[in-house]
C-alpha cells in the first residue's frame, strides 16, 4: 500500500522517489494557493450587449462611483466629442425632415439648416456662435420637434434632446463639460476596453467590447476566467431598427445576441447579470409608441411603462430559461449558473450605484464564497 505524501513522517523515512513526488506536490499546492490569491485580488467581469445599449456609460459610472472620477481637465477633453454629437444629431434631423417630408414651421429655418449642414461634425474644433444661434433657432421649430417625435424612423443619438436643451450653456466659450455631459457623450466602442477599480479590497476588472456586429469577432479571447457576465440591453429600442441594418428590429437582435452568448461554452457556469437599461427613455416614448405594434404578444395596457418593462424582462428571462442546462449531476467543481436582472438608467449615478451594490453583494460574495475566499 502506497504511503500518503501528506504523512507527518520524518524526511529520512521517504525514498528518493517519494521525496521528489512530495516536492512536486508542495509546488502544485503553492501554485494553487497563489492562483487563489490572484483570483481574490482581481476578479474579471465581461460587459456585453448590442451597440448603444449603454455599456460605455456604465463604465464611466464605475469610474465616477468607484474610481477617480473626472477631473476638470478630463471633462474638458470631452468638449469636441460633445460638439460632434450635437452636430450629428441636428444634421440627422435635418436630413430626416427631407426624407419624411416634414416642413419647417419658421421662416428662417431653411437658411439656418443650410448653415448647419455645411459643417463636417468630425472636424469641429469650436462651437462658433453662428452655428449655436442656428441650432437654437431650429430646436424651437415645430417641424424639427415633429421630426424628433418620429425619431424611431431614423438613427438619432439618445443624447440629442439633452444636448439641444443645453445649447446656450454648451456653446459658451468658457464651457467645461459637467459629469452629466460626459456621461451623455457617445463614441462607438471599437476593440476591447478595460477598467479596473477596487470594491471592499477586491479589485474588479470590467472588460467592455464593441457592440457593433463587426466587433464581435474580437471577443473570444476575453472569455477566460470571467466570474460574471453583465449584459446590457436597451428597454427603449423596441421600436427601432439596427444602425447596421434598417430591416432588423433592435430588440429582437438583442434577444438573439443574448441567446447566442448564453449558448457559448465559456459561460455554461457563469452567473448572468442582465441590466435592462434606459428606463427613462422608455417611460418617455411609451406614451406615443405602443409596444404591441412591434411585439403583438404584448397584451398589457397602452402607455404603461411598468407593464412594458415587465413584458420585456419576461422575454429575456424566457431566453435565459431556454438556454439553461441542468447541472452535471453534482459533478465536483461545477458551479450553477444564476440569473440576476435589474432595471437601470445608466446616466443616473445614484441608480447605478444602488444597482451595482446589489450586484456586488450577491454575485461577487457568492463567487468568493465558492472559492473559499470569504
Curated annotation (Swiss-Prot):
Expressed primarily in hematopoietic cells. Coexpressed with EDG6 at the same relative levels in all tissues examined, with the highest levels in adult spleen and lung. Keywords: GTP-binding, Magnesium, Metal-binding, Nucleotide-binding, Transducer. Residues 181-189 are annotated as: G2 motif. Coiled coil: none annotated. Residues 41-374 form the G-alpha domain. One of its GO terms (cellular component) is heterotrimeric G-protein complex. Mg(2+) binds at residues 56, 189. SUPFAM superfamilies: P-loop containing nucleoside triphosphate hydrolases, Transducin (alpha subunit), insertion domain. Residues 273-280 are annotated as: G4 motif. PROSITE patterns: G_ALPHA. GO terms for molecular function: G protein-coupled receptor binding; G-protein beta/gamma-subunit complex binding; GTP binding; GTPase activity; metal ion binding. Guanine nucleotide-binding proteins (G proteins) are involved as modulators or transducers in various transmembrane signaling systems. Belongs to the G-alpha family. G(q) subfamily. This is Guanine nucleotide-binding protein subunit alpha-15. The lineage of its organism: Eukaryota, Metazoa, Chordata, Craniata, Vertebrata. The gene is Gna15.
